[in-house]
Amino acid sequence: MTAPVPAPRILLPLLLLLLLTPPPGARGEVCMASRGLSLFPESCPDFCCGTCDDQYCCSDVLKKFVWSEERCAVPEASVPASVEPVEQLGSALRFRPGYNDPMSGFGATLAVGLTIFVLSVVTIIICFTCSCCCLYKTCRRPRPVVTTTTSTTVVHAPYPQPPSVPPSYPGPSYQGYHTMPPQPGMPAAPYPMQYPPPYPAQPMGPPAYHETLAGGAAAPYPASQPPYNPAYMDAPKAAL
C-alpha cells in the first residue's frame, strides 16, 4: 500500500515556519574584546567579524568570525605583567581614595551644614512657642512691679455752718433796725447760747408826785392819772 499524501492544509504551516526561521546569527553574538583595548566582551545584534586581535560587529555572513580558544590561544609570555585581573582592578577603582570627586565632598558638607541650620531655626521657633521650653519661660517671666507708696495727708476743715439767725426778743421790735445779712466769706458773729434776760415791764404811768421832792410850794399832783396811751408818744426816728 502506498503512504497517504499529507493534506495541503498541513504543508502550508510547515512552509511558513521554514520561511520565518531567522538566519543564523540573528539572535546576536558576543564578540571577544580586542587585546589591549577593552577588558569586557561586546554584544552584537548580528555577527562578530574580524580577527582574534580585532573584532567588531557586522551583518555580513561572509565576514563572520567564530572565536575559539584553540584558534585564538595566546602564549603566556606575550601577556604583559602590568595587566591586573579584572577583580583587582575593580576593587582598586572602588576603594582608591584619590579617585573620589572633590566636589562630591563639598556638596555633602554643604548639605549637612544646611540641614543643621534649618534644624536650629526650627528648634528656636518651637522653643519660643512652646510653654515647656526654657527659652519660653525666660522670655515670658513677669517683670517685678515696683510699687511707690504715696502718703496722703487729710486736712479736716470745719464744715461750713449756715448763718445763724439772731434770736428775736419779746416785745415790740424797733421798726428802723434791719438785720444785715452775713457777708460771704466772713464768719458769723458768735451769739451766746443763753437768751438775755427779758426787759422789765414798762410802768403804766409816770411815778407819783411827792410833795417832799417839789418843796412845799408845788401844787399837789392829782392822784388819779389818765391811763397810758401810746399814741401820745413821739414816733421813733428812723436810724440814719
UniProtKB/Swiss-Prot annotation:
The keyword Metal-binding does not apply. The chain crosses the membrane at residues 106-126. The keyword Cell wall biogenesis/degradation does not apply. One of its GO terms (molecular function) is WW domain binding. It is a single-pass type I membrane protein. Belongs to the shisa family. Can induce apoptosis in a caspase-dependent manner and plays a role in p53/TP53-dependent apoptosis. This is Protein shisa-5. The gene is SHISA5.
